[in-house]
Regions:
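Active-site-adjacent beta->alpha loops and helix N-cap segments on the catalytic face
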Residues: 1-15, 61-69
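Alpha-helix-loop-beta-strand connector modules within alpha/beta enzyme cores
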Residues: 7-26, 72, 78
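Hydrophobic faces of well-ordered beta-strands that scaffold small-molecule active sites
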Residues: 23-29, 51-53, 70
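Catalytic cores of alpha/beta
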Residues: 33-48, 65
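Glycine-rich phosphate-binding active-site loops on the catalytic face of alpha/beta enzymes
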Residues: 46-66
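Conserved, mostly hydrophobic/aromatic
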Residues: 47, 70, 164
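C-terminal helical cap(s) of enzyme catalytic domains, especially alpha/beta-barrels
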Residues: 59-85, 89
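A mid-to-C-terminal "edge-of-domain" accessory segment
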Residues: 79-222
Length: 222
């Protein structure tokens, strides 16, 4: 009888029915059904000693298994990074973008420009109180990319406050909260933009310019 359609079954069968040792088994997968990482992880778990990967998952058709994804799969399965420096993942992504000109989709896990960005005020409020409320891991420590916010009509006072605190590098004791006059004034201005028909997120340049208009002395910090 044919083996079931199963990565686990294939790896198990090769080892136990064909006597192929683990060290001779490696998995080469693509992402045609959004199962690239799941299949590669399953191959590891069932005895394949290696999985083939490519940086950023670049490959034929839907791409190969992303190397950066399997770094974190390895850590989650083994409980250790075994000396791997995960901040290099961000450096690799920056090189691909800035030197090669490769366009990384913004929502790509770990390396996309929006992977740890929120526009929702309720999320920003959580970030202000305790980053672990919103982020599943410390993106600053692990990838040298702190969680951040973009300002839109859903950002609210919390989103504006978080953006100002992060953009201007305010430390504990000097951070602005939702009651700050500057935060309130900025939020009212943002709301007006969307009431007037704006559809896109606010840019950093626009926000900084408005802060210069509202609080010139404060704006000098950034």
């Amino acid at each position: 009888a044919a083996l079931p359609r199963s990565v686990a079954g294939i790896i198990y069968g090769l080892q136990h029915y064909s006597d192929v040792p683990s060290e001779h088994l490696e998995w080469h997968g693509h992402n045609d059904f959004y199962k690239g990482v799941a299949n590669a992880s399953t191959a590891w778990l069932y005895g394949a000693c290696a999985v083939n990967c490519s940086l950023l998952g670049i490959g034929e058709r839907t791409g190969n298994v992303p190397l950066e994804a399997m770094v974190f799969e390895y850590a989650s399965l083994r409980g250790s990074l075994d000396g791997m420096d995960t901040t290099v993942i961000t450096e690799i992504a920056d090189y691909f973008k800035n030197e090669i000109g490769y366009n990384i989709p913004p929502m790509t896990p770990f390396v996309g420009s929006a992977f740890n960005v929120t526009r929702a005020g309720v999320h920003a409020d959580g970030l202000m109180k305790d980053e672990e409320i919103y982020t599943i891991f410390d993106t600053k420590k692990i990838l040298n990319k702190p969680a951040t916010v973009q300002i839109s009509k859903t950002s609210g006072l919390a989103g504006v406050a978080y953006w100002i605190n992060q953009t201007y590098g305010l430390e504990d004791g000097e951070k602005l909260d939702k009651k700050s006059p500057l935060v309130i004034a900025m939020k009212e201005w943002v709301d007006q933009q969307y009431e007037d028909g704006r559809q896109t997120v606010m840019t950093e340049r626009e926000l900084k310019e408005r802060i210069r208009q509202l609080a010139p002395d404060f704006a000098e910090r950034g």
